[in-house]
């Protein structure tokens, strides 16, 4: 049961989403035997959010050398997640080693860079936090298939600019809002340490 304060905080998110996550999904996801899959899926979603922000910067805002630096920054996270290479503890200290140079031809490049870099840092921090929670609960990382939710939304992205960029940003907003809504509703069903996260 959600507190009245949390219900009030979620109200704008519910209005944006237009429909709530079904109770059947919540009761299934909240079962302790599904905790490993829930955390692994969340881990992958954090990385995909960082990758999406990186794609937007690379596609619309930065020069080639900056794009290469972004790829190198995310590579260890991708290697761990998709190829199961490396030790997750080594991911803690990784950061971007280069300033991002905006494309001269873009009026919004610097603003997009600034906002998306903050988002990438936040998502990679959350990625590492999920790994810590998994370690605390003796949950080993194993590859699982990606959720179909984002793929379903992205099918509706228009193929011409600037509408394609706008559509991708809107899809990202829906994905983030749904994640927020689901975890707020799941929190009372999860162990305290995970609920606090």
Where are these regions (language model features)?
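Non-heme di-metal
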Residues: 1-197
